[in-house]
Protein backbone atom coordinates (compact mmCIF):
# COMPACT_ATOMS: atom_id res chain seq x y z
CA UNK A 1 0.00 0.00 0.00
CA UNK A 2 2.74 2.50 0.87
CA UNK A 3 5.90 0.96 -0.63
CA UNK A 4 7.54 1.88 -3.93
CA UNK A 5 9.50 -0.64 -5.98
CA UNK A 6 11.59 0.19 -9.01
CA UNK A 7 10.12 -1.46 -12.13
CA UNK A 8 12.31 -3.97 -13.94
CA UNK A 9 13.10 -1.83 -16.96
CA UNK A 10 15.33 -4.56 -18.39
CA UNK A 11 12.09 -6.26 -19.43
CA UNK A 12 10.59 -3.14 -21.02
CA UNK A 13 10.19 -2.98 -24.80
CA UNK A 14 10.95 0.73 -24.90
CA UNK A 15 7.55 1.32 -26.47
CA UNK A 16 4.88 2.80 -24.23
CA UNK A 17 1.20 2.86 -25.02
CA UNK A 18 -1.82 5.10 -25.35
CA UNK A 19 -4.17 4.18 -22.52
CA UNK A 20 -7.18 3.25 -24.64
CA UNK A 21 -8.69 1.45 -21.66
CA UNK A 22 -9.14 4.72 -19.79
CA UNK A 23 -9.92 6.76 -22.91
CA UNK A 24 -12.87 4.59 -23.91
CA UNK A 25 -14.34 4.89 -20.41
CA UNK A 26 -13.92 8.62 -19.80
CA UNK A 27 -17.59 9.34 -20.43
CA UNK A 28 -17.41 9.83 -16.67
CA UNK A 29 -14.50 9.87 -14.29
CA UNK A 30 -15.93 6.99 -12.27
CA UNK A 31 -16.09 4.75 -15.36
CA UNK A 32 -12.42 5.38 -16.14
CA UNK A 33 -11.48 4.96 -12.49
CA UNK A 34 -13.26 1.63 -12.20
CA UNK A 35 -11.63 0.15 -15.30
CA UNK A 36 -8.09 1.40 -14.59
CA UNK A 37 -7.54 -0.76 -11.52
CA UNK A 38 -4.19 -1.94 -10.13
CA UNK A 39 -4.99 -5.50 -11.21
CA UNK A 40 -4.65 -4.39 -14.85
CA UNK A 41 -1.17 -2.94 -14.38
CA UNK A 42 0.37 -6.39 -14.92
CA UNK A 43 -0.09 -5.75 -18.63
CA UNK A 44 2.35 -2.83 -18.52
CA UNK A 45 6.00 -2.70 -17.54
CA UNK A 46 5.37 0.68 -15.91
CA UNK A 47 1.87 2.17 -16.17
CA UNK A 48 3.17 5.64 -15.23
CA UNK A 49 4.35 5.93 -18.85
CA UNK A 50 0.88 5.34 -20.34
CA UNK A 51 -0.41 8.35 -22.29
CA UNK A 52 -3.84 9.20 -20.85
CA UNK A 53 -6.41 11.32 -22.67
CA UNK A 54 -10.15 11.93 -22.83
CA UNK A 55 -10.80 13.01 -26.43
CA UNK A 56 -8.77 13.32 -29.63
CA UNK A 57 -8.93 14.31 -33.30
CA UNK A 58 -10.69 10.99 -33.98
CA UNK A 59 -12.85 9.96 -31.05
CA UNK A 60 -14.43 10.96 -27.78
CA UNK A 61 -15.02 8.31 -25.08
CA UNK A 62 -17.62 5.60 -25.64
CA UNK A 63 -21.11 6.98 -25.12
CA UNK A 64 -19.97 10.60 -24.95
CA UNK A 65 -20.82 10.13 -27.93
CA UNK A 66 -17.75 8.83 -29.74
CA UNK A 67 -18.05 10.87 -32.95
CA UNK A 68 -18.40 14.27 -31.28
CA UNK A 69 -16.12 16.44 -29.20
CA UNK A 70 -16.72 15.75 -25.52
CA UNK A 71 -20.19 17.07 -24.74
CA UNK A 72 -20.87 15.99 -21.16
CA UNK A 73 -21.44 18.60 -18.40
CA UNK A 74 -18.55 20.70 -17.16
CA UNK A 75 -18.54 18.85 -13.84
CA UNK A 76 -17.73 15.63 -15.72
CA UNK A 77 -14.90 17.32 -17.60
CA UNK A 78 -13.43 18.75 -14.41
CA UNK A 79 -13.46 15.33 -12.72
CA UNK A 80 -11.87 13.70 -15.77
CA UNK A 81 -9.08 16.26 -15.72
CA UNK A 82 -8.50 15.81 -11.99
CA UNK A 83 -8.10 12.06 -12.43
CA UNK A 84 -5.95 12.44 -15.54
CA UNK A 85 -3.42 14.66 -13.77
CA UNK A 86 -3.17 12.66 -10.54
CA UNK A 87 -3.61 8.99 -11.44
CA UNK A 88 -1.43 6.67 -13.52
CA UNK A 89 0.12 7.83 -16.77
CA UNK A 90 1.02 11.03 -18.58
CA UNK A 91 -1.91 13.42 -19.17
CA UNK A 92 -2.46 14.45 -22.78
CA UNK A 93 -4.93 17.21 -23.66
CA UNK A 94 -6.45 17.61 -27.11
CA UNK A 95 -6.00 21.14 -28.41
CA UNK A 96 -8.68 23.61 -27.32
CA UNK A 97 -10.44 21.26 -24.91
CA UNK A 98 -9.31 23.69 -22.22
CA UNK A 99 -12.15 26.00 -23.30
CA UNK A 100 -14.58 23.33 -24.57
CA UNK A 101 -13.98 24.53 -28.13
CA UNK A 102 -16.53 23.02 -30.54
CA UNK A 103 -18.17 21.14 -27.69
CA UNK A 104 -20.63 18.57 -29.06
CA UNK A 105 -19.63 19.15 -32.70
CA UNK A 106 -19.04 16.20 -35.01
CA UNK A 107 -15.29 15.61 -35.00
CA UNK A 108 -14.83 14.87 -38.68
CA UNK A 109 -16.76 13.91 -41.80
CA UNK A 110 -13.94 14.27 -44.28
CA UNK A 111 -15.04 16.08 -47.47
CA UNK A 112 -18.68 16.02 -46.35
CA UNK A 113 -18.30 18.79 -43.78
CA UNK A 114 -16.52 22.16 -43.86
CA UNK A 115 -13.52 22.06 -41.54
CA UNK A 116 -14.68 25.21 -39.73
CA UNK A 117 -17.87 23.40 -38.66
CA UNK A 118 -16.09 20.28 -37.44
CA UNK A 119 -14.34 19.43 -34.20
CA UNK A 120 -11.03 19.94 -36.00
CA UNK A 121 -11.66 23.63 -36.74
CA UNK A 122 -8.85 26.18 -36.64
CA UNK A 123 -8.07 27.37 -33.11
CA UNK A 124 -5.21 29.78 -33.73
CA UNK A 125 -7.32 32.90 -33.36
CA UNK A 126 -7.94 32.06 -29.72
CA UNK A 127 -4.19 32.21 -29.06
CA UNK A 128 -3.58 35.70 -30.44
CA UNK A 129 -2.29 38.21 -27.93
CA UNK A 130 0.50 38.43 -25.39
CA UNK A 131 1.25 36.38 -22.31
CA UNK A 132 4.01 36.94 -19.76
CA UNK A 133 5.12 33.68 -18.17
CA UNK A 134 7.26 33.59 -15.05
CA UNK A 135 7.50 29.87 -14.28
CA UNK A 136 5.90 26.54 -15.13
CA UNK A 137 2.10 27.00 -15.09
CA UNK A 138 2.44 30.57 -13.78
CA UNK A 139 2.05 33.87 -15.61
CA UNK A 140 1.72 37.50 -14.59
CA UNK A 141 -0.38 38.88 -17.42
CA UNK A 142 -2.25 37.85 -20.56
CA UNK A 143 -3.94 40.13 -23.06
CA UNK A 144 -5.96 39.83 -26.23
CA UNK A 145 -7.69 36.62 -27.21
CA UNK A 146 -5.19 34.45 -25.36
CA UNK A 147 -6.05 36.34 -22.18
CA UNK A 148 -9.70 35.37 -22.60
CA UNK A 149 -8.68 31.79 -23.39
CA UNK A 150 -6.60 31.59 -20.21
CA UNK A 151 -9.46 32.96 -18.14
CA UNK A 152 -11.71 29.99 -18.94
CA UNK A 153 -12.41 27.91 -15.79
CA UNK A 154 -10.99 24.76 -17.40
CA UNK A 155 -7.81 26.50 -18.50
CA UNK A 156 -7.31 27.64 -14.91
CA UNK A 157 -8.19 24.18 -13.56
CA UNK A 158 -5.60 22.59 -15.85
CA UNK A 159 -3.00 25.19 -14.90
CA UNK A 160 -3.46 24.44 -11.21
CA UNK A 161 -3.45 20.67 -11.77
CA UNK A 162 -0.24 20.94 -13.80
CA UNK A 163 1.42 22.99 -11.05
CA UNK A 164 0.38 20.47 -8.38
CA UNK A 165 1.60 17.56 -10.50
CA UNK A 166 4.94 19.24 -11.10
CA UNK A 167 5.40 19.95 -7.38
CA UNK A 168 4.67 16.38 -6.21
CA UNK A 169 6.91 13.66 -7.74
CA UNK A 170 4.56 10.93 -6.51
CA UNK A 171 1.83 12.28 -8.82
CA UNK A 172 4.14 12.02 -11.85
CA UNK A 173 6.08 8.83 -11.25
CA UNK A 174 4.67 7.15 -8.17
CA UNK A 175 3.05 3.76 -7.98
CA UNK A 176 -0.45 3.82 -6.59
CA UNK A 177 -2.52 1.73 -4.24
CA UNK A 178 -6.15 1.56 -3.11
CA UNK A 179 -5.30 -0.42 0.02
CA UNK A 180 -6.58 1.34 3.14
CA UNK A 181 -8.55 3.87 1.07
CA UNK A 182 -12.25 4.36 1.72
CA UNK A 183 -14.23 6.66 -0.58
CA UNK A 184 -15.68 6.86 -4.06
CA UNK A 185 -12.39 7.61 -5.83
CA UNK A 186 -9.31 7.77 -3.63
CA UNK A 187 -5.81 6.34 -3.69
CA UNK A 188 -2.25 6.61 -2.37
CA UNK A 189 0.83 7.27 -4.47
CA UNK A 190 4.49 7.03 -3.54
CA UNK A 191 7.77 7.55 -5.36
CA UNK A 192 11.27 7.13 -3.98
CA UNK A 193 14.80 7.34 -5.37
CA UNK A 194 18.21 8.22 -3.97
CA UNK A 195 17.18 11.81 -3.17
CA UNK A 196 13.37 11.72 -3.16
CA UNK A 197 10.62 10.31 -0.98
CA UNK A 198 7.29 11.66 -2.17
CA UNK A 199 3.94 10.43 -0.86
CA UNK A 200 0.44 11.64 -1.72
CA UNK A 201 -3.11 10.87 -0.65
CA UNK A 202 -5.63 11.76 -3.36
CA UNK A 203 -9.40 11.93 -3.49
CA UNK A 204 -11.46 13.11 -6.47
CA UNK A 205 -14.78 14.91 -5.91
CA UNK A 206 -15.62 13.44 -2.55
CA UNK A 207 -14.58 12.69 0.99
CA UNK A 208 -12.16 9.89 1.77
CA UNK A 209 -10.68 8.09 4.74
CA UNK A 210 -7.14 6.72 4.59
CA UNK A 211 -5.80 4.03 6.93
CA UNK A 212 -2.29 2.69 7.41
CA UNK A 213 -0.59 5.80 6.10
CA UNK A 214 3.01 6.86 6.70
CA UNK A 215 3.88 8.92 9.75
CA UNK A 216 4.73 12.54 9.07
CA UNK A 217 3.36 16.00 8.42
CA UNK A 218 0.77 16.21 5.63
CA UNK A 219 0.30 19.37 3.56
CA UNK A 220 -2.77 20.20 1.45
CA UNK A 221 -1.64 20.68 -2.16
CA UNK A 222 -4.88 22.15 -3.48
Residues of each region from the PLM?
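Loop/helix patches that line or flank the sugar-binding groove of alpha-linked glycan CAZymes
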Residues: 17, 34-35, 44-216
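Generic hydrophobic, helix-prone segments enriched in Leu/Val/Ile
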Residues: 1, 26-30, 163-165
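Core domains of carbohydrate- and sulfate-ester-processing enzymes
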Residues: 6, 17-42
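Residue-level detector of intrinsically disordered, flexible termini
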Residues: 11-13, 31, 210
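Substrate-binding cleft/loops of secretory-pathway carbohydrate-active enzymes
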Residues: 1-24, 102-112
